[in-house]
Amino acid sequence: MNILKKMRGLLSLFSLTKGRTVGDLLLLFPLTIMAQDDVISCLEVYNLKTNTHTVVREFDYKIEAPNWSPDGKWFVYNSGGRLFKLPTENPSAEPIEIDTGSAKGCNNDHVISSDGKWIGLSDKWPSKVFVVPFEGGEPREVTPDGPSYLHGISPDGSEVAYCAFRGDKRAVCTKRLDDSPERCLTDADGLNDGPEYSPDGRHIWFNSSRTGEMHVWRMNVDGTEQTQMTFHDSLYSWFPHVSPNGKWVVYICYSKGDLKADEHLPNKNVELRLMTSKGKKDRQLVELFGGQGTINVNSWAPDSKAFAFVSYRLKR
């Protein structure tokens, strides 16, 4: 029986990986790949008023994807399959592990609810979405199917948005926290990833390679009026994050010559850019070494005046 189970598992694994790009495999197996990196991680804060960024803490190991808690008191990040919180007023303090119960393979897709009471996360293979109390506890499964990679929680906390691998589709889907079925909002070819709700709950922002190039898109929360928002000739645009006041969107870009459209790899020269929520006044904020793990999820401060991200240095 065990041999048969293992054979079925290998066949399932083969069916998921066959024909996939490196970008797909990073989505499918983020912990396995990222654990091989030998880097120093720099947790940084970008200040929109001064247009400067400051390293608030260095780590001699890999950390990824900071969140900024709605009360402004905590940074939350993942490392080694666990979630940790760090006081924003004293980031040199000892990191506090968040008890995620049986979820011991947390990847870089985790989001804090707008009331700060719970955390949504994606956990280990085949990466399903779970929710846990912010103060810790046993996870509750939200998506029975995987792979599912969480990126957004609705402002009222009633549903989540995620990238779902379903057959040959890589779609943006949403699901309420009850037993309701999931709704897939995109049917376009390519990778549709990074869905995040606007603070007013009217829109979902995401990135898509449906045109053959990766750009930021926006749609109504019901999936209608899917609209391209970035048009860079030399950049692939990923992971749009809307500020709490709804005015700004920060996102990360790769140079087109460095990778394929649907790959978001680590250890690349990337840039963070800012535009208005109407797609105007687009500008570069900072160039850095990073990529995967830098700003996968929303990291805005609650006052919309700053956001957090991670840059990296290779160990020599």
Language-model region placement:
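Conserved beta-strand position repeated across blades of beta-propeller domains
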Residues: 67, 111, 152-154, 196, ...
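Asp-box/WD-like beta-propeller blade repeats and closely related beta-sheet repeat scaffolds
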Residues: 104-109, 113, 117, 122-155
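Residue-level detector of Asp-centered blade-edge/turn motifs that repeat once per structural unit
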Residues: 70-71, 114-115, 155-156, 199-200, ...
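A detector of repeated loop/turn-to-beta-strand junctions in beta-rich toroidal repeat architectures
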Residues: 40, 126-128, 169-171, 213-215, ...
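Beta-strand C-termini and the immediately following turn/loop, strongest in propeller blades
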Residues: 36-37, 56-57, 70, 75-81, ...
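Blade-level signature of beta-propeller repeat domains, shared across WD40, Kelch, NHL, RCC1
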Residues: 291-316
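Multi-bladed beta-propeller domains
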Residues: 43-62, 86-106, 132-147, 175-191, ...
